[in-house]
Amino acid sequence: MAAQDVFDRSMDEDIALGNMWYEQEFKRSFTLLDMVGFSFSIVTCWTALSGVFIIGIQAGGPPVMIFGWIGVCVFTMLIALAMAEMCSRWPVAGGQYSWVAMLAPPRISRQLSYITGWFMLTGLLAMGAVNNSFGSNYILGQVNLVFPDFVIERWHTVLVAWAVGLFSLAVNVFAPHALHRLSRFVLMWNIVSFIIVITTLLATNHQKQDTGFVFHEFRNTTGFGASMATIVGILQSFFGMCCYDAPSHMTEEMTHASRDAPKAIIMSVMMGAVSGLLFLLTLCFCMGDIEATANSSTGVPVIQIFYDSTQSKSGTCILASMITVIIVMCSIGLLAEGSRSVYAFARDRGLPFSGLLSQVEPKKKIPLNAIFLTVAVQLGLNAIYFGAKTGFETVISIATTGFYVSYSLVFFARLLGYFFHHQASSFDGPYSLPLPVSLGFSAIGLLFLLFASITFNFPSDAPVTFQSMNYTSAAIGLVTLLSLLTWFTTATHRFVGPSDVKHLVVNGIGSAQTLQPTDEDGSSTSKENNGKIFS
């Protein structure tokens, strides 16, 4: 591609960003291939499923894992298609909360956008901590495999998770210019590792399970009835198919965001669905004794399956190390995505100390303060594991719930705005769906996401005790309470969210003057301290 073409496309994207009253502050370096690699490294369903494989083993077994995954992927594809057209129309780092601001009826758009932003950040920051922990589990699991006398303690897990988080911090701070190249490398590594792992397991395992075990044998050790156990088992699939909004938060660093970001969203879901299904099938056919697998001393059932298949500790460590590299690269991507989201929300005055968090380091063109805050929250959430295993298991549910609630609020705003205010009847971005299809996918997606968000609050074992209780509902209630409290105390006077100039003019909604956020003293927020352009 000619340099002039890249420059022209970047200028077009800068103009589109300016139409939402933002100025371009990042360097645009991500191409479509780079963003597919970046997004797939975060979605990377097959490695994500390996991290929560034990849930499926205990709640329903292979049939629930396989068919649950297929069902979740079908619904997720509909959601991704609908989400992609919003990303194409409004390619801005705020992602979900920005789209809600554009789609919801004007009377409630700011409030709904603000709440969406809180849930979005909750999901992103918690997911970063969860991924750090997964990386720690794989590293310590390999140590236990090689040295069976080594007993994994909770504090080991926390310290190694911190190491993963700090490594991600170092890459994001000292090598931000290499992120797009790293994404390309991770894409190739991901695909090659997937092929090697699948091929090795199928070739070395000589005691494969029969089709009856994989597709028909229902297993339930949760203490719940079959129906409840099935719902709990599907949670594995919900977690595995998540974070596909990643390209939307990196759009301000893409050379042709409005065209390529939607493609990256759709392609990452497609690749994740196929790789996840093939990986699950392989694991289920190659699984040995199900109780021994679930109770492996490594703490990672997948590592036990690798060892049972290869009968080689070195071979198992090679396969597990391939996945570990992908998980660490995912941590790097989640930190980049999370920090851009913090920056975007702060730019719209949605957070305390917004002026500080929305600053961009002029030399490296990165939101340095937002990066530091993001990693600090991740490490703080990892520290919960010092105290209780149940507490960190709740963080896993919070991470996925935060994403799913923010997704559902997007479609709620879409339908509410269309049917009650006749907004956004169609999108004029490079990628758009026919109106009936768009509305249909939005309605189906909303129902599916609400179902998923509710089920994340269920405990995973019965009888329910203080230790086994799922505290996700309490945590989500706290997030909701904090968002409402900060809204009524400070944000109601400061937060405005993004504004589409063309949309405002066409619909006669407000003006540049009336929509400006204000500081606590009532003065208008200026371009210099939040990166927004007001005339």
Model-predicted segments: where are they?
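Transmembrane alpha-helical segments of multi-pass small-molecule transport proteins
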Residues: 69, 113, 143-176, 194-197, ...
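Membrane-helix boundary/coupling elements in multi-pass transport proteins
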Residues: 92, 116-135, 236, 241-253, ...
